[in-house]
Amino acid sequence: MNVLIIGSGGREHALGWKAAQNPNVETIFVAPGNAGTALEPKLENVNIAVEDIAGLVAFAKEKAIELTIVGPEVPLVLGVVDAFYEAGLPIFGPTQAAAQLEGSKAFTKDFLARHQIPTAAYANFTDIEPALAYVREQGAPIVVKADGLAAGKGVIVAMTLEEAEEAIKDMLAGNAFGEAGSRVVIEEFLDGEEASFIVMVDGENVLPMATSQDHKRVGDKDTGPNTGGMGAYSPAPVVTPEIHNRVMQEVIFPTVRGMAAEGNPYTGFLYAGLMIDKDGTPKVIEYNCRFGDPETQPIMMRMESDLVELCLAAIDKKLDQVESKWDPRASIGIVLAAGGYPAAYNKGDVISGLPQVEIEGEKVFHAGTENKEGDIVTNGGRVLCATALGNSVSEAQQRAYELAKQIRWEGMFHRNDIGYRAIAREQQK
């Protein structure tokens, strides 16, 4: 069978690498892919942009694609799933209406309130003055979010009133995030530990993936601006079996039931970004309608089930008949980024030291890379993700940093403490 994966990041490289392990899969086309997917056995890049919905549909028809997996959020919010359904093509992802869970933060907060799903107290604004008045009344720290898609960067955690006021003015008047910021959500600052809780949904049944924890801030010890994610590990020890159960009962099931009841049944990967407070109460910070990046990379390293079979079962509404199996080892992925990221950065720098031979339990997933005249060069802010398995998070971390150490380009940087919370827990034991 032929498979299509939409996207060009580290997440799509990891999904493609995992899907290629299915013996019935002949070719996995990645649109548009990157330099890493181009080199992967069974994978083939196709020069179609993720926003080119008509082009993707035409290609899937031409190649008789039997499964399409959508990586990023943009095509989902543009309605790629609806277009594939109309053409009678099998695709795993939420419809345009269901993808509002990620596409609009205001929609999501109102949905959570309607279904009594735990989240931070909030208010939505389109005008500056009422927004400023609300912030002054609430005080800092407080969180200001652009309503629409902003590539993971439209969230400002304001520690002072000045920062909050500046963020509101930037978004509502300065148009810092364009259309995405024409409405803002202001919400209470939640204290606790974050976790990424990702599940597969077929409309009603839910299959949990392994838990993970992302590191959003650009700098060590969680300093500096938010990014799309600087590294992740799986499993996340903060999600104990009791908390896992609470998340399923209090967050995931009510979300899936609520979407179905409102006429937007949800199919696809559903990612709940959670804050878990000291009492173990999970609250929803955000939803994503897709697998996280970089969480996909360590999670796929641990997945022992067949990803293609799971996606096909979900499309057939048979997720209750399959199970997911996981490597008991921990996995960690460290993002290697271009100097300047998440602000302006260089492209086109030649990357050296990429591993020529793959070692079991180690993998460099490509994100912002391209092939230029035989050289692999940088082509994005997050360039690579050095990923490794280990018997503990400490061991996985050591292996991943060893792997990262061999790779070089002008201006490359990474965080040096990915996994620090889990390692602190391991040391306490």
Curated annotation (Swiss-Prot):
Pathway: Purine metabolism; IMP biosynthesis via de novo pathway; N(1)-(5-phospho-D-ribosyl)glycinamide from 5-phospho-alpha-D-ribose 1-diphosphate: step 2/2. It catalyses: 5-phospho-beta-D-ribosylamine + glycine + ATP = N(1)-(5-phospho-beta-D-ribosyl)glycinamide + ADP + phosphate + H(+). It comes from the Bacteria. ATP binds at residues 135-196. The keyword Transferase does not apply. PROSITE patterns: ATP_GRASP, GARS. Its cofactor is Mg(2+); Mn(2+). GO terms for molecular function: ATP binding; metal ion binding; phosphoribosylamine-glycine ligase activity. Residues 109-316 form the ATP-grasp domain. Its EC number is 6.3.4.13. Keywords: ATP-binding, Ligase, Magnesium, Manganese, Metal-binding, Nucleotide-binding, Purine biosynthesis. Binds 1 Mg(2+) or Mn(2+) ion per subunit. Belongs to the GARS family. This is Phosphoribosylamine--glycine ligase. It comes from Vibrio vulnificus (strain CMCP6). The lineage of its organism: Bacteria, Pseudomonadati, Pseudomonadota, Gammaproteobacteria, Vibrionales. The gene is purD.
